[in-house]
Curated annotation (Swiss-Prot):
ATP binds at residues 110-117. It comes from Adeno-associated virus 2 (isolate Srivastava/1982). The gene is Rep40. Residues 84-239 form the SF3 helicase domain. It catalyses: ATP + H2O = ADP + phosphate + H(+). InterPro entries: Helicase_SF3_DNA-vir, P-loop_NTPase, Parvovirus_NS1_helicase. One of its GO terms (cellular component) is host cell nucleus. Keywords: ATP-binding, DNA replication, Host nucleus, Hydrolase, Nucleotide-binding. SUPFAM superfamilies: P-loop containing nucleoside triphosphate hydrolases (SSF52540). Residues 264-301 are annotated as: Disordered. PROSITE patterns: SF3_HELICASE_1. Pfam families: Parvo_NS1 (PF01057). This is Protein Rep40. Plays a critical role during packaging of viral DNA into empty capsids, where they are thought to be part of the packaging motor complex. The single stranded genomic DNA is packaged in a 3' to 5' direction and requires the association of viral DNA with Rep40.
Length: 312
């Protein structure tokens, strides 16, 4: 029982994860005569408990407060693209905790090498159970999305055949989906993260593209536009960075606007200039205006000069 509790706390669902987390304990259990059955039973029980009693935030939010978040790769990607990391982090946290109602999806949009897959992959791998949408199989695209903590839709497209089920899943509604070689199964409200460089709000119907579902789809998403390419040595986002980012978000929550486009901003304000930087105001150059002569005075002077000429 103690072993199962430890596996649940660590989010371990396979022998590989167990070895990576604590090799010594795995070897000690594997040395017993009936070790194989014990290990399998412990992992099965832990998996059932996690799927029934745990949610994504239980594994995404770290336990320890984070003092310096500036070196976190998720923080860097968001800041590089002009987003306020604190506001964006609050969007991610609210998304994971299903706080925003039917706006249940984060869409990371942008070209290759901008970090969208880097972020989504790290978040998906941090939770014990995540499902991937297989959009190439229109008959069973959501076959892998049942009983998951996070659903990841990678580089997909929206087709007329799946759009209604997709709207329900993206909006966090319960929906039954067909499964291959099985009866239909229910997908419970699950946070969805989408990564693509195509318009996920345009529905492809054969050779035509329609936009009749654009507004309903936008009402179910937060869209981040990642356009800045990362350096070749930027590196992969780690599980610990994911946990640190969500923990920092929890400790610095701000109010989030329910809008399709996540607002940008948060640029650092320029400091006020010091006294040394303030130069003395330039002195205004004073000019002495010459006295002007009115028209009446000019005519009198002309008449006077004319009279003097005649007298001479």
């Amino acid at each position: 029982m103690e072993l199962v509790g430890w596996l649940v706390d660590k989010g371990i669902t396979s022998e590989k994860q167990w070895i990576q987390e604590d090799q010594a304990s795995y070897i000690s259990f594997n040395a017993a005569s009936n070790s194989r059955s014990q290990i399998k039973a412990a992992l099965d029980n832990a998996g059932k408990i996690m799927s029934l009693t745990k949610t994504a935030p239980d594994y995404l939010v770290g336990q320890q407060p984070v003092e310096d978040i500036s070196s976190n790769r998720i923080y860097k990607i968001l800041e590089l693209n002009g987003y306020d990391p604190q506001y964006a982090a609050s969007v991610f946290l609210g998304w994971a905790t299903k706080k925003f109602g039917k706006r249940n999806t984060i869409w990371l949009f942008g070209p290759a090498t901008t970090g969208k897959t880097n972020i989504a992959e790290a978040i998906a791998h941090t939770v014990p159970f995540y499902g991937c949408v297989n959009w190439t199989n229109e008959n069973f695209p959501f076959n892998d999305c049942v009983d998951k903590m996070v659903i990841w839709w990678e580089e997909g497209k929206m087709t007329a055949k799946v759009v209604e089920s997709a709207k329900a899943i993206l909006g966090g509604s319960k929906v039954r989906v067909d499964q291959k070689c099985k009866s239909s199964a229910q997908i419970d409200p699950t946070p969805v993260i989408v990564t693509s460089n195509t318009n996920m709000c345009a529905v492809i119907d054969g050779n035509s593209t329609t936009f009749e579902h654009q507004q309903p789809l936008q009402d179910r998403m937060f869209k981040f536009e990642l356009t800045r390419r990362l350096d070749h040595d930027f590196g992969k986002v780690t599980k610990q960075e994911v946990k640190d980012f969500f923990r920092w978000a929890k400790d610095h929550v701000v109010e989030v606007e329910h809008e399709f486009y996540v607002k940008k901003g948060g640029a650092k304000k320029r400091p006020a200039p010091s006294d040394a930087d303030i130069s003395e105001p330039k002195r205004v150059r004073e000019s002495v205006a010459q006295p002007s002569t009115s028209d009446a005075e000019a005519s009198i002077n002309y008449a006077d000069r004319l009279a003097r000429g005649h007298s001479l």
